Curated annotation (Swiss-Prot):
Similarity comment: family membership: Belongs to the universal ribosomal protein uL11 family.
InterPro entries per record: Ribosomal_uL11 (IPR000911), Ribosomal_uL11_bac-typ (IPR006519), Ribosomal_uL11_C (IPR020783), Ribosomal_uL11_C_sf (IPR036769), Ribosomal_uL11_CS (IPR020785), Ribosomal_uL11_N (IPR020784), Ribosomal_uL11_N_sf (IPR036796)
GO cellular component: cytosolic large ribosomal subunit
Protein name: Large ribosomal subunit protein uL11
Subunit structure, as described in the record: Part of the ribosomal stalk of the 50S ribosomal subunit. Interacts with L10 and the large rRNA to form the base of the stalk. L10 forms an elongated spine to which L12 dimers bind in a sequential fashion forming a multimeric L10(L12)X complex.
Length: 144
C-alpha cells in the first residue's frame, strides 16, 4: 500500500552543500523531518555534480515523517550565465544592454541538459526556449 503524503517542499539547494542551517533546517524542522538524514542523502546523491551548483529539489514528506526527494537540473539562467562567463544578467532587457554572448551550440548544449525539465520533447523547441531565456537576460546568442 502506498504511503500517505503529508506535503511537498520545493527548495533550491546547492549541490554537495546541504546543511542543517536555514533554509533547509528551518523548512524541514517545521515538518519534523530528520534534517541530517536529508542532508546526508542529498549530498550523497549530488556528489557527482559540481559543488555549489544550485539544484531545484522537490521533497515529498510522508505522514510517518519519512521523505523522498527529486533533484532537477540546474536553472537555465545559471547555465546560461556559466556558458557566457558572466556573474549577472542585464538589468535592462533584450538588445538594450548586452552583458555577454553565447553561441547557438551553447544553447543546444544547455537545451540537452534541461530536456527532462522542459515542456517539450523536441530539441529545436528546447533550444528556442533557452535562446529566449538568454535574450531576456541580456545575453546575445550568436551563430545559426
Amino acid at each position: 500500500m502506498a504511503q500517505k503524503i503529508e506535503g511537498h517542499i520545493n527548495l533550491n539547494v546547492n549541490a554537495g552543500e546541504a546543511t542543517a542551517a536555514p533554509p533547509i533546517g528551518s523548512t524541514l524542522g517545521q515538518r519534523k523531518v530528520n534534517i541530517m538524514e536529508f542532508c546526508k542523502a542529498f549530498n550523497a546523491a549530488t556528489q557527482s555534480i559540481e559543488k555549489g551548483t544550485p539544484l531545484p529539489t522537490v521533497i515529498t514528506i510522508y505522514v510517518d515523517k519519512s521523505f523522498t526527494f527529486i533533484v532537477k537540473t540546474p536553472p537555465a539562467s545559471y547555465l546560461i550565465k556559466k556558458y557566457a562567463k558572466v556573474k549577472k544578467g542585464s538589468g535592462a532587457t533584450k538588445k538594450e544592454a548586452v552583458v555577454g554572448k553565447i553561441t547557438m551550440d551553447d544553447c543546444r548544449e544547455i537545451a540537452k541538459l534541461k530536456m527532462p525539465d522542459l515542456n517539450t520533447k523536441d530539441i529545436k523547441a528546447a533550444t528556442k526556449i533557452i535562446c529566449g531565456s538568454a535574450a531576456s537576460m541580456g545575453i546575445e546568442v550568436v551563430g545559426n
